[in-house]
UniProtKB/Swiss-Prot annotation:
GO terms for molecular function: chemorepellent activity; fibroblast growth factor receptor binding; protein-macromolecule adaptor activity. Residues 419-517 form the Fibronectin type-III domain. PROSITE patterns: FN3. Residues 1-35 form the signal peptide. This is Leucine-rich repeat transmembrane protein FLRT2. Expressed in pancreas, skeletal muscle, brain, and heart. N-glycosylated.
Amino acid sequence: MGLQTTKWPSHGAFFLKSWLIISLGLYSQVSKLLACPSVCRCDRNFVYCNERSLTSVPLGIPEGVTVLYLHNNQINNAGFPAELHNVQSVHTVYLYGNQLDEFPMNLPKNVRVLHLQENNIQTISRAALAQLLKLEELHLDDNSISTVGVEDGAFREAISLKLLFLSKNHLSSVPVGLPVDLQELRVDENRIAVISDMAFQNLTSLERLIVDGNLLTNKGIAEGTFSHLTKLKEFSIVRNSLSHPPPDLPGTHLIRLYLQDNQINHIPLTAFSNLRKLERLDISNNQLRMLTQGVFDNLSNLKQLTARNNPWFCDCSIKWVTEWLKYIPSSLNVRGFMCQGPEQVRGMAVRELNMNLLSCPTTTPGLPLFTPAPSTASPTTQPPTLSIPNPSRSYTPPTPTTSKLPTIPDWDGRERVTPPISERIQLSIHFVNDTSIQVSWLSLFTVMAYKLTWVKMGHSLVGGIVQERIVSGEKQHLSLVNLEPRSTYRICLVPLDAFNYRAVEDTICSEATTHASYLNNGSNTASSHEQTTSHSMGSPFLLAGLIGGAVIFVLVVLLSVFCWHMHKKGRYTSQKWKYNRGRRKDDYCEAGTKKDNSILEMTETSFQIVSLNNDQLLKGDFRLQPIYTPNGGINYTDCHIPNNMRYCNSSVPDLEHCHT
C-alpha cells in the first residue's frame, strides 16, 4: 500500500497570506497608539500636543507621524530632545506661541513647513538652519529678529527654502545671503530704511516681494536693486516714504505693482515704460497733482488702475488724462481721478471735464480766449439785459459799475481788451407766481458750470442767509421756489469758467421783488414787511386750523342730534311704562312721602270688590283714598273731600276720607 499525500488547497494559502497582512497592519496601528506620548493625543498621522502648558517637546514621538502640533505652550530652546531630530516622517511642525528666544535646534531633519511666529526669537544661527536641508516654508512673523541677530549667510544654509516670512520684526535692512531658490519674501512691518544692491542679487526665482510698512525712501534704495528680480510677478512697497516710484523695475513678468500710501508727487515718464505685462497698478493716497503725458502709454495689458485720494489739480496739464480716459478700452477699469482743485471744479470727475474749459495759461499761442474788442471800447460796463413780462411787477435793476477792462496779451505780444462779463452773459427773470421765480441766462461763450446764489433782502438791504446752486454749463435756466411773497431777493450768477476766473469781476447780480400773496388780494395791505412775512409763514397753519375746526363742528352737531334723539325716545318710553309713574316727583307728592307696599293702588276710574272662590270677605276696615294726578284722572268732585290739594301740600293727611 503506497503512501498517499494531499496537496494544500490554493485558496487556503491565499487566506493565510491575507490574515498575516491584516495582523501586521493591526499590530502597527496598535503600536502607534501605544507609542503616543501620554500628554498628547494621536489621530492617524497627527500628534496634538498643543495648549498643554508644556515646557519641552514630549519624548516618544512615534515614527510615521507627519504633522506635529506644539503651538501655544511654554516650550523654550532647551526643550528639544536630540531624538526628535531623528523622526524622519515629520514634515510639518507648529511651534508658534511659545517662549523661544533663538532659532531652535534638533528639529525633525525632514521638516518642510515650520511655524515659529509669535515667539521672542532674536537670533538665527547658520548651524540651526543647516540641519533643515529640506525646509521649504519658514514662518518667523511677530518675533524680535534684528539685522545684527541674523548670522551672515544663515538663510542660505536652508538650500530648499521657497517661502520666507519675516513680517513684524525689528529688521533695519533686508538680510543678505538669501537662498537662490526663494520664491516669496515678506519683510513688511519692519524698520527697513536701506536696501543694498546685494540684497536681491542672486534671487532670480523670486516671484513675490512685500516690503510694506517700512521707512524706505528713494535715497535708501540702491540703484539697480530690483533689476535682478527677472521673475518678479508682484511687488508691493506700500506705506513708505517714496517721492517717486523705484527705478529699474523688472518688467519681464511683473503683473501687480502697489505704490499706495507713499509721498509720491511725480512719476517720471519712463517709470512704467518696461512694464508691458503689468495688469494692476495702484497709486492711491499719494501727493500727485498732475501726471506726465504718456506715462501710461506702454501699459498695454493694464486691467485696473487706482488713483484715489490724490490732490489732482484740473488745469491744462490734465487734458491728456481726460482724453485718455475717454478712449481707454472697456477691459481697463480706472478709478479715483477726481478733481481737488481749483475750487470751481472740486469734486468733479476728470473723465467728465470739458477739455476746452480747463484752466489753461492765457499766453497759449494760437488759442484766443475771447473775440478782441475795439480799442475804443467804453470802460463802463453795461447792466445785463432783463426780460420782464409784466412792467407792473416790482424790479430793481442793478447799479452800473465802472471798472477797468482786463487785457490779455495776444500770441504776437500785443494786448487785447477782454469784454466785460455783463456783455457776454444776459440775465433774465420771469415771475412764475408769488413764491417762484425762473432765472434764465444766455452766455456768449462756453462755460463749464454756473453758480446761482440768491438771498432775501431786508429793509436795510442787508443780506440774510445765502442760498446757492451749482448747475452744469449746458443748463440755461433755474427755477427758484419756496420764496416769500412781497419780498426782495438779490440774485447773482457766477460763471465757473476756468478761463481767468475772478470771483468778483465775473459775477453778475440783479434784484427782484416777488408779488404779494394771492390770499391778500381782497384784504388790506400789510402794514409792514414783517406782517406779510408772518401771514405767509402762517398760511399753511391757518388752512389746517380751518379744516380742523370744520371737522370738530360737524362732530359736535352729530353728537347733539344723537343725544336729543336718545332723550326724546327715553321720555316717550317712561310715559308708556305705567309702573314708572310712581317714581315721578308729582306722584310721590300726591301719594305721600314714600310708596307703601301695604296700600293697594288702583289706577282705574271704577272698581268692584268681589269675593274670591265664594269666600267671605275678610272683616276689616278698608280705606279708599283717591290720588289726583296733575295730568288727569279722578276729579276732586268725585269725592266729598272739598280740598284735596291741601293733602298734597301738607305732610299729614286730612281727617275725613272715603270709607267702605
